[in-house]
């Protein structure tokens, strides 16, 4: 039986957002913006994640605290609220906030796939960087997890990739809080190496995980960056790699420094948006 879906909406950027049924996973929806798949949600089982990079982030969420323990989480970029739904399903009682620029997108998501009524999830509208600068004082030092997954269409905007931007995130983290960043990149991995250099400037421990061919710059894809606010060990990282999806490679310590190479931390004046994906990447 097909799912009744709302009509596509035009966002303030002029891009079109729409939901489609996933023909391979019954009861699931895919949110696309400007033809680029942005989010996948399983309406029947929100604790099941589909996209590879989302599964990697899901494993971070599973491992960085005791199983089932409620957390405080801030999501920069809403998409279809896939990860907030996952946290609500796997860590009930968690307190979560989402910052999303596009109010029309939020309305579309709420219509197509409403959040659980009792979920402790609040949505704030606005540009992530602007809203970060005026969050309540009570959120300072209180976030166990901050997820950065910000895209305008298929690119991460430049102003949410700089050291100044991450400088607004750092004070929000609890002493052992974690930041997780989703980045997309291709040949040379210049954007992602710059993100890693920027995070290393702000946080004591950073790890990068992705498919080996993507990390080598031979293929366009997602790379997940993990940064710790205070735990220099991150002793759960080996388990993160083992969780998959596979193949996967993790870069930490000396390997990460060598991979970053000459890439410098990104400043506002040098920031660039992430590269566009190849046109054929999402062809079916």
Which residues are covered by each model-predicted region?
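SAM/dcSAM-binding transferase cores
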Residues: 1-23, 38-44, 63, 216-284
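Short strand-connecting beta-turns/loops that link adjacent beta-strands
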Residues: 24-26, 175
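Short polybasic amphipathic segments
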Residues: 29-33
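A short, flexible beta-alpha/helix-coil linker loop
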Residues: 36-40, 151-154, 179, 186
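The AdoMet/dcAdoMet-binding core of the Class I SAM-like
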Residues: 44-171, 187-190, 196
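A generic structural signal for alpha->beta connector loops
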Residues: 93-95, 118-120, 176, 203-205, ...
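C-terminal substrate-binding/active-site "lid" region of AdoMet-derived donor-dependent transferases
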Residues: 164-234
């Amino acid at each position: 039986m097909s799912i009744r879906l709302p009509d596509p909406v035009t966002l303030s950027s002029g891009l079109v957002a729409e939901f489609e049924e996933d023909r391979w996973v019954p009861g699931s929806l895919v949110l696309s913006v400007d033809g680029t798949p942005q989010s996948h949600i399983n309406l029947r089982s929100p604790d099941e994640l589909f996209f590879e990079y989302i599964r990697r982030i899901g494993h971070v969420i599973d491992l960085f605290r005791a199983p089932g323990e409620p957390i405080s989480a801030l999501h920069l970029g809403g998409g279809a609220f896939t990860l907030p739904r996952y946290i609500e399903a796997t860590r009930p009682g968690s307190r979560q906030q989402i910052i999303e620029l596009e109010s029309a997108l939020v309305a579309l998501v709420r219509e197509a796939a409403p959040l659980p009524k009792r979920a402790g999830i609040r949505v704030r509208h606005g540009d992530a960087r602007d809203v970060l600068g005026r969050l309540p004082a009570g959120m300072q030092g209180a976030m166990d997890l901050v997820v950065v997954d910000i895209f305008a269409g298929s690119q991460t905007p430049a102003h949410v990739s700089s050291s100044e931007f991450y400088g607004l995130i750092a004070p929000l983290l609890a002493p052992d809080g974690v930041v997780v960043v989703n980045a997309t990149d291709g040949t040379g991995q210049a954007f992602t190496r710059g993100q890693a250099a920027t995070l290393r400037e702000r946080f004591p421990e950073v790890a990068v995980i992705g498919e080996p061919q993507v990390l080598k710059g031979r293929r366009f894809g997602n790379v997940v960056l993990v940064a710790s606010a205070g735990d220099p060990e991150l002793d759960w990282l080996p388990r993160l790699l083992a969780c998959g999806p596979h193949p996967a490679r993790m870069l930490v310590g000396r390997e990460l420094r060598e991979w970053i190479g000459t890439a410098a931390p990104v400043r506002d004046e040098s920031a660039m948006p992430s590269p566009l994906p190849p046109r054929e990447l999402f062809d079916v």
